Amino acid sequence: KADNVRVFELGRVFFPDETVGDSETTVKGVRQPLHVAGLVYGDAHEDCWAEAKRPVDFFDVKGDVENLVAPLKATFEAATHPAMHPGRCARVIVNGKAVGFVGELHPKVCRVYELPKPPVVFELEVAPLCELDVPSARAVSKFQPVHRDISVTVPNDVTCAQLQDAVARIRRTKPEAMIIESLDLFDVYRPEASAEKSMAFRLTLSTQGSEAIGEKDAEAAFVAVEQAFADLGATLRK
């Protein structure tokens, strides 16, 4: 048995679909979308003095999927799939459309094949990943970005994606939030037997204007983010 495996496959899958007719590229009654699938098993990286040895996990392959669909942005939501672990599986969404799944192989399948560690697998539909807009150049700001860390306490059922989506909405609708460049999660703490968790984000502000971001502008953007978080039940940690 191989200790470490990295494999992928690109090919067509077949579904019955009576809306499909005969043509030079199709067969009546059969839909044949192109899919890409991959499997990672074993250690997360080769032996290295700078890295502790550990098995590959869900988040390693989630990162691979994000790199695969770039420059499009993938989001993930908890899901179930008959071939995947019921608690370690996510639906992959690109441009608002579900394009596939990523997750650990189901424990029952691992037992059948006597695998001591669970492989992490993914499968994606290819066509939506090719729907790219023509990129447009963006001027580089003359000023350094402003960073501010935000720590909040949120109910356990509130996800990072929900909070980031809320901030994306206010960027489009509130003038004071348009200087927000990104909101990145860098820490999560879940106390035992608690209905809440703590999440820490780094807020980055940037402007293409002729003036640097002032303290009042930064504070207004921060308050807008705080209000967006509050709508989801998040409270600012003092």
Please describe what each predicted stretch is.
Residues 2-11, 17, 24-25, 31-32, ...:
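A carboxyl-terminal module marker
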